[in-house]
Amino acid sequence: MDSNTVSSFQDILMRMSKMQLGSSSEDLNGMITQFESLKLYRDSLGEAVMRIGDLHSLQNRNGKWREQLSQKFEEIRWLIEEVRHRLKITENSFEQITFMQALQLLLEVEQEIRTFSFQLI
């Protein structure tokens, strides 16, 4: 796990939590929650990959891990679309920078999860 990615997650989550987007603050809180969940999932996959032969353990813990993986990719796609939408509608440069960095981070995390999952398959 890249320490820069971890600090990027923490930085973006902190900045997103400080944003006041009016009536859409509940949506933003939902995005933050999904972002945190995605980070934890990515981290757990990375740890599983680092432990050689952990596929059996992963399958025993969660017999439906492929289903869960598919669900996480759907969440990533939804978050990417949501961040892109927010990026288009916001005029605040602080928010634009935050959402651009969140988008970049989501794309990096998607790639990391793909890499981890291929190593586990």
Swiss-Prot record:
Cellular component GO terms, alphabetical: host cell nucleus; virion component
GO biological process: exit of virus from host cell nucleus through nuclear pore
InterPro entries: Flu_NS2
Chief location bin: virion
Keywords: Host nucleus, Host-virus interaction, Transport, Virion
Entry-linked SUPFAM superfamilies: Nonstructural protein ns2, Nep, M1-binding domain
Top-level taxon in the UniProt lineage: Viruses
Short motif (Nuclear export signal): ranges: 12-21, 85-94
Cell location: Virion; Host nucleus
Coiled-coil regions listed: none
Function in brief: Mediates the nuclear export of encapsidated genomic RNAs (ribonucleoproteins, RNPs). Acts as an adapter between viral RNPs complexes and the nuclear export machinery of the cell. Possesses no intrinsic RNA-binding activity, but includes a C-terminal M1-binding domain. This domain is believed to allow recognition of RNPs bound to the protein M1.
Other remarks on this protein: Average number present in a viral particle is estimated to be 130-200 molecules.
Family: Belongs to the influenza viruses NEP family.
Subunit structure: Interacts with protein M1. May interact with host nucleoporin RAB/HRB and exportin XPO1/CRM1.
Name the UniProt record assigns to this protein: Nuclear export protein
